[in-house]
């Protein structure tokens, strides 16, 4: 399984637009399709047109449940994005491992909204997942000092920073 914490397109790495970078990433992910599930938590450069000034994302055009046949055995839920559409921008995956037992991985979009946190909480507390170990995959969680991030300067709203994700 592959887990990545975002930064898929990045305006500081060359001369490609966000769309061109997503297309490049999509070609790379195609090599994994049908082989392993991959879980993407979008970062600050994955949302908005530049860097998290709004909640728009190109991800649903490139990463969706039918794309990778491995999602059929691991993707257990998708949450609504800011438009009210279920996408893999907020997604949950289940894995079973002899050593670790039952695992639920929840991937959040950068600075998740209250609705995404509520959706995840309901999953975690459900009868089906109540006894699972839970991994939360998100972007921009710890600062350089190792402390949870309490505030960032992005204009994105509504949103929750790391400390709010942790306490909710």
Language-model features: where?
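Generic preference for flexible, low-structure residues
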Residues: 75, 121, 150-152
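Active-site micro-motifs of SAM-dependent methyltransferase domains
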Residues: 4, 46-47, 142-143
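Predominantly extracellular/lumenal beta-strand repeat domains
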Residues: 4, 37-39, 147-149
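Active-site-proximal segments of metal-dependent phosphoesterases and phosphodiesterases across multiple
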Residues: 11-18, 117, 127-168
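Extended active-site neighborhood of metal-dependent phosphoesterases/phosphodiesterases
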Residues: 9-119, 128-129
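Active-site metal-binding motif and surrounding structural segment of the metallo-beta-lactamase
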Residues: 1-8
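Active-site neighborhood of phospho(di)ester-bond hydrolases with catalytic His/Asp-centered motifs
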Residues: 1, 34-43, 108, 135-139, ...
């Amino acid at each position: 399984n592959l887990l990545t914490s975002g930064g898929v397109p990045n305006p500081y790495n060359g001369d490609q637009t966000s769309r061109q970078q997503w297309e490049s990433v999509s070609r790379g992910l195609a090599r994994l399709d049908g082989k392993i599930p991959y879980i993407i938590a979008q970062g600050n450069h994955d949302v908005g047109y530049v860097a998290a000034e709004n909640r728009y994302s190109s991800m649903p055009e490139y990463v969706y449940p039918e794309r990778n046949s491995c999602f059929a055995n691991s993707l257990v839920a998708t949450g609504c994005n800011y438009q009210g559409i279920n996408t893999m921008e907020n997604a949950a995956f289940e894995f079973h491992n002899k050593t670790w037992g039952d695992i639920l991985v929840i991937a959040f979009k950068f600075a998740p909204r209250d609705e995404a946190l509520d959706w995840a909480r309901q999953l975690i507390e459900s009868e089906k997942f109540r006894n699972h170990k839970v991994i939360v995959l998100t972007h921009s969680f710890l600062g350089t000092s190792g402390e949870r991030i309490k505030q960032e300067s992005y204009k994105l709203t509504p949103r929750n920073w790391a400390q709010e994700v942790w306490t909710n």
